[in-house]
C-alpha cells in the first residue's frame, strides 16, 4: 500500500521544475503551507495512479477544512490517525533530520544515524539538512499549522 507524503509530492514538483513546482517553491522554502487548491490537485493526481487502486496511506493531509472537504469528494477514508507531539520534540527531530540527496532516505543525527557520517546507508548518497528544517522555519511552520489546521 503506497505511503503518500504531501511534502514529498511538493518536493517532487519542485525538483522536476514543473509549472506547479515553480509556483510552490517560494511557499515551501519559507515554511508556508502550499495553498489548498494546489495540494488537492497534487493529491488527486497521485491517488489516481494504479498503485493506489486498493488504497493508500496519507501523511500530512488534510491540514485544513477545505482540504478535508475536497478529500471527501475524491476518496473515502477507512481510518484516521492524528499524532500529537510537543513543539520542542518537533523542533528537535526536524532540526536533526538528514535527507539523502539521491534517494530521499531519512536519517536523524540523534536517533537514526547513518553507518558512515554524511552518507546514506541505502545508496551512498550525500546527506543534507533541508532548508525548511532550520528551527526558525520550523517554528513558522508550526504557527501556520495552528492557524490553518
Residue positions per predicted region:
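Low-complexity, compositionally biased segments
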Residues: 19-22, 39, 62, 81, ...
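Small-molecule kinase domains that catalyze NTP-dependent phosphoryl transfer to phosphate-bearing small molecules
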Residues: 38-46, 106-149
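Residue-level recognition of specific faces of alpha-helices
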Residues: 23, 67-70, 79, 93, ...
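ATP-dependent small-molecule kinase phosphotransfer cores
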Residues: 2-76, 86, 99-102, 130
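Conserved phosphate-donor/acceptor-positioning beta-strand/loop module used by diverse small-molecule
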Residues: 59, 75-97, 101-102, 110-122
Amino acid at each position: 500500500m503506497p505511503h503518500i507524503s504531501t511534502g514529498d509530492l511538493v518536493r517532487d514538483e519542485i525538483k522536476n521544475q514543473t509549472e506547479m513546482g515553480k509556483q510552490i517553491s517560494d511557499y515551501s522554502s519559507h515554511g508556508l503551507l502550499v495553498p489548498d487548491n494546489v495540494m488537492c490537485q497534487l493529491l488527486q493526481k497521485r491517488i489516481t495512479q494504479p498503485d493506489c487502486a486498493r488504497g493508500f496511506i496519507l501523511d500530512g493531509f488534510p491540514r485544513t477544512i477545505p482540504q478535508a472537504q475536497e478529500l471527501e469528494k475524491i476518496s473515502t477514508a477507512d481510518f484516521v490517525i492524528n499524532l500529537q507531539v510537543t513543539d520542542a520534540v518537533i523542533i528537535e527531530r526536524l532540526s536533526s533530520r538528514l535527507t539523502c540527496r539521491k534517494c530521499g532516505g531519512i536519517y536523524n543525527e540523534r536517533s537514526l544515524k547513518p553507518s558512515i557520517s554524511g552518507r546514506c546507508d541505502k545508496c551512498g548518497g550525500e546527506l543534507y539538512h533541508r532548508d525548511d528544517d532550520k528551527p526558525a522555519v520550523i517554528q513558522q511552520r508550526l504557527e501556520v499549522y495552528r492557524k490553518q489546521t
